[in-house]
Structures are given as C-alpha cells and as structure tokens.
C-alpha cells in the first residue's frame, strides 16, 4: 500500500501574462486612434483647412501651408520617440503607452475646437495653435507605435512575433476606415457650408471616445516579460537614447531606410490620392488639375482600398514567419518600385483604373507595413528596444512622410500630372531595397534573451 504525501511547500506561482485578447485590443486601439487622427487631419487638410486657416493665400499656397502644418507632427515624432522611449526603456512599456495615448488624445480634441482664422483676433493665432497641437500630436505619436509594437511582440510566443506584430499594424486600416466613414456621414448629412463651418470638427472631438476606451484597456495591462527580465537583470539603461546610439547606431540607420518606402507609399496613397482625386479638372484658383471626383465617391474608393490594406496586413505575418522578414520585404519593395511607374496609366484608366491603383497600392502597403512591428524591434536588445525601434520608425516618418505630401503637390504642379510623383515613390523604394539587401535576417534573433546593449 502506498501513501501519497503532499508537500507543504508552496508551489511556484505561474507568472502573470497578458492574454492574447488583451494584447490585441491594447496594441490595436492606440494605433487605430493614431491613424484615425492622422486621416482626420489629412482629410481636413486637403478639403477645408486651406480655406479655414490660410484664407489669404492662393489655392496652391494655402494647400502647401496646410500640408506644412501637417508635417510639423512628423518633425516632433523623433523627439517623442526619444522622450517616450526613455521612459519606456526605464519605467516600463505599460506606463509609457498610457502617457503617449493621453498626449496625442488631448491634442487631437483641442484641434476640434480651434476657431477659424477668419474669426476676429484669430488670423495669426489660429494657425499657430493648429501647429502647436500638431506638434503635441507628434510627440505622443512618437512614443505610441514603438510601445504598441513591443506590447505585441514581447508578449508573443516564440515563432509568432511577426503574426502578433500585425495586431498594432491593423490600427492603420481600421483608423482610416473609421475616419472616412465619419467624413462620409457628415458630408452626406451636412451642406458644404455646414461641414466647413463646424462639421469638420466632429471627427476630432469624437476621437475622445476612442482615447477613453484605450486608457481603460491599457491600465489593465501587466508589464511585458522582456522588460521584466531587464529589470531583474539590473540592465536598465541610464540614458537609453545615448546607449542605443552608442551601441546600435547602424541599426537605427538601417531601420530608418527600411521604413522609407513604407512611409512614402502610405502617405501618397492616403493623402496625395485624395487631393488629386477630388481636385477640379479645370481649376480656376491656380491649383493643379486633378481627376474631378466627388469627395464622397473618392472616399468610398479609398475605403475599398483600405479593406485590402487590412487583409494583406494580416496575411503578411504568416508570410514573414515562413520566408523571413528580409526576403519577403525585398520582393514587396520591388513591387512598390514597379507600382510607382504605373501611376500615370492607372490614373488615366477611368474609375476602374483609379480603383485598381488604390487596391494595388493598399495591398502593397499591407504587405510592407505588417512585418515592420516585428522587424524593427528585432534589431535592438530589450533594454533599449523601445527607444531604438521608435527612433528608427519616426526618423523614417520625416524622410518618407513629412515631406511626401508637400513634395507630391510640388511635383504634381511641375509636371501637371502624377508622373513625377510615381517616380518619387520608385526612388524611395530603390533606397529601401538597398537597405534591406544590406540587412541580415532578424527572424531567428534571440529576442527574449537579448537583454543588454
């Protein structure tokens, strides 16, 4: 006869982890807000901000001024990546994600209440406040993506980082679709005068609901296993930005240029195409000629494209796990280079050609954007990962995104067609192709064990 004896020693507690569902929602909600805010601004910058905040300029100058204000956020983003990266690598991912969400959320709501420059006393103040809000948005955005990417990938099971990394990336198509649906609903229920007077403010004010939901979810998170290991190993960097530039500056340069084509494609597809699509075929205000689509019709076409964006973002994760980040992205980047040369024939192909351009462009966007949430963090050890991934991502935003709408309008006006805009995209893709060619594969790095720079 045997007697089982139960030890009185306490069992080792199972480490607490974030559930897959919580990781999905918490990483997705912030980037959804980020891109919702971006597209709300980009749409307003194309459609109403030139007249509201720069009323004394001609059509082209007002549009360029509107996009210049748009670009201020991208200048602020690297500063935000350093600021929030510092706390993300020293205090933790969770706390920093809450702070970045609050920063960009408050700035977005304030944009929704700025008086137009035509109001007495606001001729100079209104555009200045707009620029200040865009700067604050940029600071918050600079810390948002890196934290969301780490939340997903540092909680991912081994061999599934690229798949889990698509969670925050899905925020881009979701945010765009939400913003477009809001603008369509407003445009269909308001007159042009009502939309210009107050309707454009609704998307900015409505974002407060998303911010509240995001804060509620993120406050329930626990810290990621990777950062916990850094703390336990006493490997927390004193000054993460100094440490990452001292030990990993080549990886920052590599990551920046790897992201270049993604950002260029992204902002040409979402900002330039809308502006070109709805511009009059025979403008009388000095603006370059466009396709003359009704605003609502073109927004629906963009929504169709964004659906493909979301689907192929999801598809990119398994592909990047199977074939590797580098190999997959080399093929996709080559496709982007060819796509840039198709701008003119597709834009000239009527509605079918334009819709095909949007579907193809957004498909490539999903395939190139999806793996980035795994690839960029994989370049850096855990104790400087938040700072390193964020800095590379946001430096690329200046080179590939901040100037893209501005340069695109200038090239469009110079050539009186989108031909040079397409060449511009092809050049950015060529630069990214070289950066990828020089970068080693990151799929098999010791992601959880690589703690110290």
Residue ranges and their predicted role:
Residues 163-187, 393-404:
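Glycine-rich segments within core transmembrane alpha-helices of 12-TM secondary carriers
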Residues 326-371:
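C-terminal transmembrane helical hairpin of 12-TM major facilitator-type secondary transporters
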Residues 45-77:
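Extracellular/periplasmic helix-loop-helix junction of adjacent transmembrane segments
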Residues 383-414:
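A late C-terminal transmembrane helix in Major Facilitator Superfamily
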Residues 81-93, 312-325:
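Helix-to-loop junctions at the C-terminal end of transmembrane segments
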Residues 42-43, 249-309, 400-404:
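Extracytoplasmic gate region of multi-pass secondary transporters
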Residues 102-122, 334-349:
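C-terminal ends and interior cores of transmembrane alpha-helices
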Residues 214-221, 427-453:
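Multi-pass alpha-helical transporter architecture, strongest
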């Amino acid at each position: 006869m045997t007697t089982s004896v139960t030890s009185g020693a306490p069992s080792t507690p199972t480490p607490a982890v974030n559930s897959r569902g919580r990781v999905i929602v918490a990483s997705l909600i912030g980037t959804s807000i980020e891109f919702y805010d971006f597209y709300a601004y980009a749409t307003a910058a194309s459609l109403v901000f030139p007249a509201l905040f720069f009323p004394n300029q001609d059509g082209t100058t007002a549009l360029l001024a509107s996009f210049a204000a748009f670009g201020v956020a991208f200048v602020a983003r690297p500063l935000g990546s350093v600021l929030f990266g510092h706390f993300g690598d020293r205090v933790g991912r969770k706390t920093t994600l809450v702070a970045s969400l609050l920063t960009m959320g408050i700035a977005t709501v304030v944009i929704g209440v700025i008086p137009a420059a035509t109001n007495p006393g606001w001729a100079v103040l209104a555009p200045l406040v707009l620029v200040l809000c865009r700067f604050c948005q940029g600071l918050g955005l600079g810390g948002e993506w890196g934290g969301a990417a780490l939340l997903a990938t540092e909680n991912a099971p081994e061999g599934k980082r690229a798949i889990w990394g698509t969670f925050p990336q899905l925020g881009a198509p979701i945010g765009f679709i939400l913003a477009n649906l809001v603008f369509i609903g407003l445009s269909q229920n308001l007159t042009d005068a009502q939309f210009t007077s107050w309707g454009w403010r609704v998307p900015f004010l409505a974002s407060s609901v998303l911010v509240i939901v995001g804060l509620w979810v993120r406050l329930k998170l626990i810290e990621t296993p990777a950062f916990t290991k850094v703390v336990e190993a006493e490997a927390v960097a004193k000054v993460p930005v100094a440490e990452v530039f001292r030990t990993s500056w080549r990886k920052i340069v590599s990551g920046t240029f790897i992201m270049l084509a993604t950002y260029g494609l992204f902002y040409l597809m979402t900002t330039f195409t809308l502006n070109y699509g709805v511009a009059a075929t025979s403008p009388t205000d000095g603006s370059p000629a466009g396709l003359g689509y009704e605003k609502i019709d073109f927004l629906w076409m963009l929504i169709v494209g964004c659906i493909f964006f979301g689907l192929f973002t999801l598809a990119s994760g398994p592909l990047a796990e199977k074939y590797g980040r580098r190999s997959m992205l080399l093929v996709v980047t080559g496709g982007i280079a060819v796509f840039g040369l198709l701008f003119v024939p597709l834009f000239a192909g009527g509605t079918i050609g334009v819709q095909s351009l949007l579907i193809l462009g957004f498909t490539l966007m999903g395939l190139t954007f999806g793996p980035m949430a795994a690839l960029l963090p994989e370049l850096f050890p855990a104790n400087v990962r938040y700072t390193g991934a964020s800095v590379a991502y946001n430096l690329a935003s200046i080179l590939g995104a901040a100037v893209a709408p501005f340069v695109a309008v200038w090239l469009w006006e110079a050539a009186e067609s989108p031909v040079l805009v397409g060449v511009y995209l092809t050049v950015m893709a060529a630069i990214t192709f070289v950066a990828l060619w020089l970068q080693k594969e990151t799929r098999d790095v010791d992601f959880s064990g690589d703690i110290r720079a």
